[in-house]
Structure formats: C-alpha cells, structure tokens
A protein has these predicted regions:
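Short proline/glycine-enriched turn/loop motifs at strand-loop junctions of beta-rich domains
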Residues: 34-41, 48-50, 71
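Short beta-strand elements bearing conserved aromatic residues within extracellular beta-rich modules
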Residues: 41-43, 76
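The feature marks proteins involved in alpha-glucan
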Residues: 1-30, 50, 54-139, 144-151, ...
Length: 160
C-alpha cells in the first residue's frame, strides 16, 4: 500500500483530491476512484457515448483509467459492481464540478483554468491566521432552505 493511501484510509491525507477524481493527463483526463470492495468499475460519460470503459484496479483498491477524448465540462459517472453483484451508477466523490439539479452527473473540470479572486482574504489570513480566532460552523442544505416560487433552487449568488 502506498503511503498516501495508507494515510487516506486512516483519515489523515488531506490532499486526496490531488490524486483521486478526474485530472488532466498528457492526452485527455485520468480518472481515479477508491472502491476496494468492488468487483468491477467502469467509466461512462459524454466522451465515450456513456458506454462503460473498464477501469484498472491497483493494490490499494484504486480504479483508474485515462480517457483520451474527455474534455472540460464532459459529464461522467462510475459504473460500480459491488461485492454483492449489484451494479450502480455513482457520481465521483472527488469531482471538482457537478451537474445542476436535478442532474447528478459529475463534470470534468480543470482547476488550473479557474480564476481565483481570494487574494485579499489570503493576505489577511497570512497576517492573522484564522486558527487563532473563534470557529463557527453553520451547516445548511441550501437546496431545501429556500427556493424560487416555482420550486427551483436559488443559486449560491442569489442566496448570498
């Protein structure tokens, strides 16, 4: 077992997103999902006509495949056959982007293309680390908290 996956299984690898999920490759994107008890995992998406392509399992239980035709914003899911023989279509737990409801597909995304706008906040944190102050965690499921009159969900910007 690799050191990183050992830390992942122990709950202490805080950078698993750098390995698992969909990541740019020299040609296309490489997809990885941890499913140690799965009998079989396939990758299906816009880039292969939703025809599941067999993924390859390593000794850590990580299934991987590089899809040469995958591009940013392509939708995809993992087709997982569990130890019980049942097959389910699953979203990527490490996806950087997802469909808007009611869709549940994961979407290919390249974080290097995102324009971050948090420079002022990062400077403030460098000068005054937030870990030295109080912590407040408020959890809310935005989709069930407030909606438009027609029942559709508000965007993050509308809720802000």
């Amino acid at each position: 077992m690799t050191k990183e996956m050992e830390r992942f299984r122990g709950g202490s690898w805080d950078s698993a997103y750098t390995y698992l999920g969909a990541h740019p490759a020299p040609q296309g994107y490489t997809f990885r999902v941890w499913a140690p008890h799965a009998r079989h995992v396939a990758l299906a998406g816009d880039f292969n006509g939703w025809q599941g392509a067999d993924m390859h399992r390593d000794e850590d239980g990580v299934w991987s495949l590089t899809a040469e035709n995958a591009a940013v914003y392509d939708a995809y899911k993992y087709v997982v056959t569990g130890a019980d023989g049942r097959t389910v279509w699953k979203a990527d737990p490490f996806a950087f982007h997802a469909q808007t409801r009611p869709g549940t597909d994961s979407k290919v995304y390249d974080l290097s293309e995102y324009g971050w706008h948090d420079g002022a906040w990062r400077e403030k944190c460098a000068a005054e680390p937030p870990v030295n102050g109080p912590l407040l965690i408020y959890e809310v499921h935005l989709g069930s908290w407030r909606r438009h009159e027609d029942g559709t969900s508000l965007s993050y910007r509308e809720l802000a």
